[in-house]
Amino acid sequence: MINAMTTSALDSGEIKLYIKDIMRPVLGIEDLYKAIKAIIDCKENKRGLYNLASFNKTAEQIAYEVSEVVGAPVVEYEADPTQIGNTKAQTKTYNFSISTTKFKRAFSFKFKETVESITKSIFDNYKDIIKTNRGKIFDYEWL
């Protein structure tokens, strides 16, 4: 979501916001790396299923925080539920939020990434990011 909003801002000059009330968990790449390292470095057997997320926020909160970093306006569009293929997303209140309490307690872990830190990373590295058309097949073998 942050990737798409930042890319939209840099490519079109605006952040498009359709279903603003959907709650989303977001995991920053630095937090992912540190969480995996915490698991690998742990000397105890703490096998289990864990949720990982740097934070949970609504699409609206994320959009306006991305806007602060990139300086592009948020343009709110009214989503047409008949044009949304994912039936779960047809409601304005679908909630994807997750709890990371179990992981934080088990590994004494603190998630640190924010919308701002993730957006700045994308913004600062934008020219080096390989952009693809999601509608076309892309051959990554040459990388």
Regions found by a protein language model. Give the residues of each.
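NAD(P)-dependent short-chain dehydrogenase/reductase
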Residues: 1-24, 29-34, 66-67
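Mid/C-terminal beta-alpha module of Rossmann-like enzyme folds, strongest
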Residues: 5, 38-88, 100
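A general structural signal marking secondary-structure boundaries and capping sites
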Residues: 9-13, 42-43, 70-74, 107, ...
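Core catalytic loop region at the nicotinamide-binding pocket of NAD(P)H-dependent oxidoreductases
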Residues: 13-17, 39-52, 129-138
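Residues that recognize and position ribonucleotide moieties
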Residues: 25, 55, 96-97
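Conserved C-terminal active-site "lid" loop/helix of NAD(P)H-dependent oxidoreductases
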Residues: 29, 60, 82-110, 130-132, ...
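Non-catalytic, hydrophobic alpha-helical segments
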Residues: 32, 36, 52, 62, ...
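Amphipathic terminal alpha-helices
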Residues: 114-143
